[in-house]
């Protein structure tokens, strides 16, 4: 099966899709490319993908993020280049909420 989610504008819709992807990920592999913090926060593993140019050649770099890097990335997705302490706290809260949701899913499936 293939699931396709169109770009969502509303936070509530994004949260519902994130929860559905978390459910599906318990039995299938899910790869999600997103700019929505609600979806990104639900990831078990979070990668940052960047494209650049060097000496006339385009390159792509992929880096697995640790928790601190995830928080910074979610804060960046939320508010742009200028990251504040409040944005970092909000990102941490998103991750904690996602972890709580996934823990409840895991305990339900046992």
PLM-predicted stretches and their roles:
Residues 4-7, 11-110:
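C-terminal lobe/lid and adjacent interdomain/linker elements of RecA-like ASCE P-loop ATPase modules
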